[in-house]
Amino acid sequence: MNEEEQFVSIDLNDDNICSVCKLGTDKDTLSFCHICFELNLEGVPKSNLLHTKSVRGHKDCFEKYHLIANQDCSRSKLSKSTYEGVKTIVSKKINWIVQYAQNKNLDLESECSKTSQHPLLNFRHKPEKKLLPQFDSQVPKYSAKGSAGNAGSISSYAQRILEHRENTDFRLGLLEDADALWTHSHSQAQKTEETSSGPEGTIQTQNPHYSREELNSMTLAEVVQLSAKLQQRIQEVFEELTHQVQEKDSLASELHVRHVAIEQLLKNCSKLPCLQVGRTGTRSHLPMNH
């Protein structure tokens, strides 16, 4: 076969774009996910991995992707089987029902004559509140001594919600930092402008203005000195703007990577390790073909 008749294979999918951040980059900086590769070597099946070998991207992007994916999926919960999880939930529910029924019957038998002052009956007459707390919270005892203490207590379910809200504040952290950075720089610029203006006011301003008559009346040395000051001021402003633009670009890039990673996690939720437990549980009910 002649050299002119030889075919060249072209990969149409090779567009030098990171699959995580969706930004164009050099081909040498792209590689497959090293975290999924190490998990595969440890024995994790390919169906449970987040990325395949065909997915290319930056090393930092893959690390941030797995960091976000592992925030809500702890290894302690993943190690439990489906039967253990269901057994724990059912046992908690049954124990809570038994405790609630026992406390309710004891209070009704001991204080049935005090209908107007009974905490349980007063609690039932408030339809805007829930009659039953969450099943995994501590069962309240409806007695005259314990009503004052239980009124201000917070259930463990509410505490977990508050902790979850504190952990998910990272989504607004970047925006707050950017806003604080902008307000800090703006206030600092105003302070420098106020301090630079002395008692004369018109001569030592940040951006002085000179008329044509004033410039014509200056000597050559004064004009050269004024030009040097203006060039120095322009250089300082340029460096400050460059620094602000670089910080803004870095914050925007990090925020973009987080948003793209969250969107892909929502789209590929079936591949998350925390959902593989339920999938294996449903497969166990299927009949096996011998």
From Swiss-Prot:
<keyword id="KW-0524">Neurogenesis</keyword>
<feature type="region of interest" description="Disordered">
    <location>
        <begin position="185"/>
        <end position="206"/>
    </location>
</feature>
<comment type="similarity">
    <text>Belongs to the EURL family.</text>
</comment>
<dbReference type="GO" id="GO:0060999">
    <property type="term" value="P:positive regulation of dendritic spine development"/>
</dbReference>
<protein>
    <recommendedName>
        <fullName>Protein EURL homolog</fullName>
    </recommendedName>
</protein>
<comment type="subunit">
    <text>Interacts with CCDC85B.</text>
</comment>
<keyword id="KW-0221">Differentiation</keyword>
<dbReference type="InterPro" id="IPR009704">
    <property type="entry name" value="EURL_prot"/>
</dbReference>
<keyword id="KW-0175">Coiled coil</keyword>
<dbReference type="Pfam" id="PF06937">
    <property type="entry name" value="EURL"/>
</dbReference>
<dbReference type="GO" id="GO:0021895">
    <property type="term" value="P:cerebral cortex neuron differentiation"/>
</dbReference>
<feature type="coiled-coil region">
    <location>
        <begin position="228"/>
        <end position="251"/>
    </location>
</feature>
<comment type="function">
    <text>Plays a role in cortical progenitor cell proliferation and differentiation. Promotes dendritic spine development of post-migratory cortical projection neurons by modulating the beta-catenin signaling pathway.</text>
</comment>
